[in-house]
């Protein structure tokens, strides 16, 4: 969802075969009882004024249960409830489906628009980064009662932490040309709450500090322990995306 005063030239290509629904028509009823998206499902809901397309919502089918939705209204036609009409049609068309819409934190237009149409914030996803020059903890300073294992695959490294020969957790690091990306950080449930994830991450970060300049990760703010841990490890939040759901 774009900001109100975006100074951007936009070009869209719309196939007439996909334009099956307009805001002047009754919503179609192609949704099946088994909650799957069918190949004949309406791809675009369009709004016209004097035979000119002034806005639309497109539904790109990814698979039978997933779709990517894009909405746009020409700037000169905004504030005329066209977007609300389109969202109303969309909500009717997809009333049996869960819809989650990502919005940048600095977007001042989208939140009110979405709330008006029955979408409310559920989670906030943060992108975080650390420059490897800021990683100074040395493995020699770690508790010697722990063992670490490193497994290298193509473009990916797996780190594991052991205590008394028990595997208590692991994390994955994907290696790209410009950065590394930490993901799938997990401590076995019986060992959580003891600071083991911090030890695992410190070891992993120090090991890869000479491989890439920056290391990134994604975490939801609602995952308070993980979010606070990354901040303690000097990760900096670079962007936030708020997800609005049709609750």
Tell me the role of every PLM-derived stretch.
Residues 100-111, 217-227, 243-247:
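Conserved beta-strand-loop-alpha-helix junction that forms the acyl-donor binding cleft
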Residues 110-115, 119, 230, 235:
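Conserved active-site tyrosine of GNAT-family acetyltransferases
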Residues 1-35, 120-166:
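Short amphipathic alpha-helix that is part of the acyltransferase structural core
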